[in-house]
A protein has these predicted regions:
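Conserved donor-binding/catalytic core segment of Leloir-type glycosyltransferases
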Residues: 4, 187, 193, 197-223, ...
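A short, histidine- and acid-enriched strand-loop-helix "catalytic/donor-clamping" loop
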Residues: 8-11, 94-97, 105, 109-127, ...
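Conserved acidic donor-binding segment of nucleotide-sugar-dependent glycosyltransferases
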Residues: 102, 320-330, 339-345
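Donor nucleotide-sugar binding/catalytic pocket of nucleotide-sugar-dependent glycosyltransferases
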Residues: 134-185, 259
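Nucleotide-activated donor-binding/catalytic signature segment of Leloir-type glycosyltransferases, i.e.
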Residues: 243-266
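Acidic donor-binding loop of glycosyltransferase active sites
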Residues: 256, 273-289, 304
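Short alpha-helical donor nucleotide-sugar binding micro-motif in glycosyltransferases
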Residues: 262-263, 270-275
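Short hydrophobic beta-strand element within catalytic cores of glycosyltransferases
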Residues: 298-308
Length: 382
């Protein structure tokens, strides 16, 4: 079966491992179509061709790059006519233009199609997005939901077709792995350079966008309440960076807070093991709640303990392999950090649990196999 996947998320090199795993499976000829870059309020990300073995990775220009709702690929029709897929996998929400455009083109060329959704809030969209959504519900042979709550949203809005819960991407446990003893020794002997945290401190890490809903301001307040020697590494970019740096100055902790900026996904497996804990302090918004928290499974795969806000899908991702605090509770987060800073054996235990949970649920190979099963079901029916 010939499958074409269209995904702006695949500009991230680490995410391409899922496609390498898919391409290994029997009976599939896989092509991915991605934009040369994607930019939004968190910054500009160019395509990183990191994992491209076994399938074809094509680029296609976007119109309205950076607009989640309105972007689309004007040359997609020509590409589909050349590739003649049996299945078109639009890795997009059903309410956006790219998904509607892709599913319409798939219907015209006789291909079955499916979409992906993270949407775990029952939002109502104005026209034309409500029109796109309902049209895609009718055209799609299947849907993939990133979490269980997204299925309930689909059903409440009228989707009656088959749907399966599969996270969008997993992690490769051979790449995201704990540091070896030799690597830990090397890291411990390194001198901090520039804005890198000292290896002698209890190191708290955050990875993700610097946007209000990610709650990095809460993390700064929580860290300001810590005693002893500690440092905070903030990995990522976004419009809040200046405000967060100013907040660190006001709190008197600027010397312990290190803004690392954006790093390629290929560097993350070497960064996470340097941290003693990763924190995801997200806060809900009327139009958004955490849908998965991918950085959690990346850190867990590296044997790094995690702390997250009790919001959205985060408790289901962590299970019993990390600590939770009530959303917005600075004191609760400070207490969780203090407990881990004082107890190395507890950190090691949570790190082991986290990696075991990833190996059981969230590897790229497992997610690729589940996705392949969906493709086979569609192919048999159509």
């Amino acid at each position: 079966m010939r499958v074409v996947m269209v995904s702006k998320a695949l500009v991230v090199g680490a995410y391409q491992r899922k496609l390498e795993e898919l391409a290994k499976l029997p009976g599939i000829e896989l092509t991915a179509i991605v934009p040369p870059s994607w930019h939004d309020r968190r910054g500009h990300r160019k395509l990183d061709r990191a994992h491209t073995h076994g399938y074809e990775l094509l680029t296609a220009a976007l119109v309205f790059n950076g607009s989640y709702h309105c972007h689309f690929y004007p040359t997609l029709g020509r590409l589909l006519r050349r590739l003649r897929p049996d299945i078109l996998h639009m890795d997009e929400e059903p309410y956006n233009l790219a998904a509607w455009h892709g599913l319409r083109l798939a219907q015209a060329c006789g291909a079955a199609s499916l979409f992906f959704t993270w949407q775990n809030l029952p939002r109502r969209y104005p026209w034309p997005f409500s029109f796109f959504e309902q049209a895609n519900y009718r055209r799609a042979a299947c849907a993939i939901a990133g979490n269980q709550a997204a299925i309930a949203v689909l059903r409440s809005k009228g989707y009656r077709g088959p749907v399966t819960v599969i996270p969008q991407f997993g992690v490769d446990p051979e790449i995201f792995r704990p540091a070896t003893a030799a690597e830990r020794g090397t890291q411990g002997n390194e001198e901090p350079q520039g804005d890198a945290p000292s290896s002698a401190a209890f190191t708290v890490g955050y990875a993700g966008g610097l946007v209000p809903e990610k709650g990095v301001d809460l993390l700064l307040h929580a860290c300001a309440g810590l005693s002893g020697v500690w440092s905070l590494a903030i990995l990522g970019e976004g419009p809040e960076r200046g405000r967060l740096a100013a907040q660190a100055e006001r709190l008197g902790i600027a010397g312990r807070v290190h803004f690392l900026g954006h790093r390629p996904s290929t560097e993350l497996p070497a960064i996470y093991p340097r941290w003693d804990v990763l924190v995801l302090p997200s806060r809900s918004r009327p139009n958004w709640v955490e849908q998965f928290g991918r950085v959690l499974i990346e850190a867990m795969a590296c044997g790094v303990p995690v702390i997250a806000a009790h919001t959205g899908e985060l408790p289901n991702v962590i299970g019993d392999a990390g600590l939770l605090f009530e959303e917005g509770d600075v004191g609760g987060l400070t207490s969780a950090l203090t407990a881990l800073a004082a107890n190395g054996s507890r950190r090691a235990e949570l790190g082991q649990r986290g990696r075991a949970r990833v190996l059981a649920r969230f590897t790229q190979a497992q997610i690729a196999a589940a996705t392949h099963q969906v493709y086979q079901q569609i192919y048999r029916v159509n």
